[in-house]
Amino acid sequence: MAIINMSDLDLQGKRVLIREDLNVPVSNGVVTSDARLRASLPTIELALAKGAAVMVMSHLGRPTEGEYNSEFSMQPVVDYLAKALSCTVRLATDYLDGVEVAVGEVVVFENVRFNKGEKKNDEALSKKMAALCDVYVMDAFGTAHRAEASTNGVGLYAPIACAGPLLAQELDALGKALDNPARPLVAIVGGSKVSTKLTVLESLSGIVDQLVVGGGIANTFIAAAGHNVGKSLYEADLIDEAKRLVANAQSRGGDIPVPTDVVVAGEFSPTATATLKSVSDVSDSDMIFDIGPDSAEALAKIIESAGTIVWNGPVGVFEFDQFGEGTKRIAQAIADSKAFSIAGGGDTLAAVDKYGIADKVSYISTGGGAFLEFLEGKELPAVAMLKKRGA
């Protein structure tokens, strides 16, 4: 089933309602990180260039639903967009019963979470939003995994529902990485807990040629291999699960390699002293915070031979430089690789920024939870809705 793309539509004189992910950090009324806003600009500019009357909506933060709270107002986003687009951008506070918007104009709706029923995908609210437009554009990959009124319900009732360029790019990149990858396909999954990424690990272990685990997740696999992990964060109740995942990968000719050397310390602190040890020499008082140089080189070799790389999560506590060498080496290997690479998730993007490899990664996903759910093999509610409307 084909999804309609906004770029293929004639929008001249049309009222176009775009759902973007403009959920950005704001401090004292000023946007402090504009990555999501920058990512949304080409879609808004394209709608204007196509002669549309443009309405934009998003959530911002986690206000109490149905209650106005100035702390979560879209005003700072409106100010940013007015500068970035070099045109007048208005904030509409009461818009559900109709809003005046002219061709060539941009109106941003106040925080959609100020509307009661937004998160429950309320039908009446969805229909009111749909009545405001001729064309609804879903462009917020970061919220595509949530079935809410502004991301899902509105699209069921709008005259036309389509994917914006940003969402289309995300789906193309993820499809290229997972549905039809150039092999070998290597996935790097980091993070603190196996439990939060278990479904991802299960899904990926069935399709990748090599699965690399890092961070606290790796500690559980180290313990499963029979090594002492000392006071490290790990999940004893998931050791059998880790063994099963390794066996599953090996049965397909792949593997989930366990680090041979690790970087440990006696405490979790920015000033903790880092000590390099063989994985078999970890003491009861040690905490593992990174992989060692031998392990990092072995993983770099796996990455260098890859045809496709999916990266979600650092392999160490890279926020502290003494525990960042493993993640830095992985980042460098991805940057040097000729493979198609996709990176996603907040910590991963922070590592991409820290090690300056953004322009060397083929595609950087804007979605956190949505990226993970896609890796889990789930169909995202927004995508299901767009397929239904495109049929």
Swiss-Prot record:
Sorted UniProt keywords: ATP-binding, Cytoplasm, Glycolysis, Kinase, Nucleotide-binding, Transferase
A Pfam family hit: PGK
Coiled-coil regions listed in the entry: none
Sites where the protein binds ATP: K197, E319, G345, G346, D347, T348
One GO-annotated biological process of the protein: gluconeogenesis
Domain of life, per lineage: Bacteria
GO cellular component, one term: cytosol
EC nos: 2.7.2.3
Positions of substrate binding: D21, L22, N23, R36, H59, L60, G61, R62, R113, R146
Keyword ATP-binding set for record: yes
Associated pathway: Carbohydrate degradation; glycolysis; pyruvate from D-glyceraldehyde 3-phosphate: step 2/5
Gene Ontology terms, MF aspect: ADP binding; ATP binding; phosphoglycerate kinase activity
Catalytic reaction equation(s): (2R)-3-phosphoglycerate + ATP = (2R)-3-phospho-glyceroyl phosphate + ADP
Compartment list: Cytoplasm
Protein's UniProt keywords contain Cytoplasm: yes
InterPro entries listed in its UniProt record: Phosphoglycerate_kinase (IPR001576), Phosphoglycerate_kinase_CS (IPR015911), Phosphoglycerate_kinase_N (IPR015824), Phosphoglycerate_kinase_sf (IPR036043)
Family recorded in the similarity comment: Belongs to the phosphoglycerate kinase family.
Subunit structure: Monomer.
Protein name, per record: Phosphoglycerate kinase
Source species: Shewanella sp. (strain W3-18-1)
